[in-house]
Amino acid sequence: MNFFLSSRWSVRLALIIIALLALIALTSQWWLPYDPQAIDLPSRLLSPDAQHWLGTDHLGRDIFSRLMAATRVSLGSVMACLLLVLTLGLVIGGSAGLIGGRVDQATMRVADMFMTFPTSILSFFMVGVLGTGLTNVIIAIALSHWAWYARMVRSLVISLRQREFVLASRLSGAGHVRVFVDHLAGAVIPSLLVLATLDIGHMMLHVAGMSFLGLGVTAPTAEWGVMINDARQYIWTQPLQMFWPGLALFISVMAFNLVGDALRDHLDPHLVTEHAH
């Protein structure tokens, strides 16, 4: 609440947008006016009216219903990416920082190799190796981002592992896992969440881009990238078909980026998060 009240108006608006997106993603399946996958050819390419607030697409599907349903798919995909990449970052980075030695050296050499390439290129490469489909796209995006999270966790753990409370815990017989959970996780997670919030926008663009190219979510499932791809051939005659999912993606990415920047300034102003996407 203090963060909300002390933030700029733009950040407050972004937080409201994110809350609204989360609400739509969680509840839209119960109040959509139309089935987002229902084909109605006699109603194809209709302009916005009282029955179809945003019009219909080339198959007569209600664009508003598809846009709301796509929110759930897009946000759900990104949350799955974040959960996986945070887990990898905590486990790999925490292990490297606490164990040290050859484990640390080997882990960081692998991380450096991953960090050499832009995450977008790595994501496409991973999809080429794993195959198409939403699950593989989620895994690919997580694998292209884990090194940044692992390196951050490792740096924070190294800076804390010689503190008196950590040494006392080790002397009492606590293992690496116990030391990390009891004493280090609380110091690591805030910085990790800042980086995660800053990365949500990039991940949303990656998921939408993969789906646009037919590598992730595929038709008839409603997803913003799929909707933009479906609307390509009608861009000159029915530009609103592409405008609505593009606007939803733009607003979502901007909202998460604004909140991420504000969180970084609020929690960790010295956090370095510049990495190649």
Swiss-Prot record:
Any one GO BP annotation for this protein: nickel cation import across plasma membrane
Subcellular compartments: Cell inner membrane
Residue ranges annotated as Cytoplasmic topological domain: 1-12, 100-120, 205-207, 261-277
Keywords assigned: Cell inner membrane, Cell membrane, Ion transport, Membrane, Nickel, Nickel transport, Transmembrane, Transmembrane helix, Transport
Keyword DNA-binding: no
Topology term for the membrane: Multi-pass membrane protein
Transmembrane segments: 13-33, 79-99, 121-141, 184-204, 208-228, 240-260
Family annotation (InterPro entries): BP-dependent_transpt_permease, MetI-like, MetI-like_sf, Nickel_NikC
Main location: membrane
Topology, Periplasmic side: 34-78, 142-183, 229-239
Domain ABC transmembrane type-1, residue spans: 67-260
UniProt GO MF annotations: dipeptide transmembrane transporter activity; nickel cation binding; nickel cation transmembrane transporter activity
Cellular component terms per the entry's GO annotation: ATP-binding cassette (ABC) transporter complex, substrate-binding subunit-containing; membrane; plasma membrane
Job of this protein: Involved in a nickel transport system, probably translocates nickel through the bacterial inner membrane.
NCBIfam families: nickel_nikC, PRK10417.1
PANTHER family: D,D-DIPEPTIDE TRANSPORT SYSTEM PERMEASE PROTEIN DDPC-RELATED, OLIGOPEPTIDE TRANSPORT SYSTEM PERMEASE PROTEIN APPC
Family stated for the protein in its record: Belongs to the binding-protein-dependent transport system permease family. OppBC subfamily.
Binding partners and assembly: Probably forms a heterodimeric pore with NikB.
Protein name as catalogued: Nickel transport system permease protein NikC
